[in-house]
């Protein structure tokens, strides 16, 4: 993982460790949005991984059907 991707992943790691267990599992996609974000950052680095994550979060809302959405 690039240094930029690592820094960007810190809030995601915090969410997964401390906030995620307290919240209901409501993600419409598989894998979950946080798992997708970590995979995108590891596979594509900080810039493209962040863009893919942002696009995924925009789609994770009640008007999108969700489904299986692997990291490209």
UniProtKB/Swiss-Prot annotation:
A GO term from the CC aspect: plasma membrane
Annotated compartments: Cell inner membrane
Domain of life (superkingdom): Bacteria
Alphabetized Pfam families for the sequence: YidD
Keywords (A to Z) from UniProt: Cell inner membrane, Cell membrane, Membrane
Keyword Cell inner membrane on entry: yes
Keyword Repeat: no
Membrane topology annotation: Peripheral membrane protein
Cited SMART domains: Haemolytic
PANTHER family, alphabetized: MEMBRANE PROTEIN INSERTION EFFICIENCY FACTOR-RELATED (PTHR33383:SF1)
Function: Could be involved in insertion of integral membrane proteins into the membrane.
UniProt record similarity statement: Belongs to the UPF0161 family.
This protein's name: Putative membrane protein insertion efficiency factor
């Amino acid at each position: 993982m690039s240094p930029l991707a690592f820094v960007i992943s810190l809030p995601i790691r915090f969410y997964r460790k401390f906030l995620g267990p307290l919240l209901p599992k409501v993600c419409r996609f598989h894998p979950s949005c946080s798992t997708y974000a970590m995979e995108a950052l590891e596979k594509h680095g900080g810039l493209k991984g962040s863009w893919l994550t942002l696009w995924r979060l925009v789609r994770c809302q009640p008007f999108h059907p969700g489904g299986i959405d692997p990291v490209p």
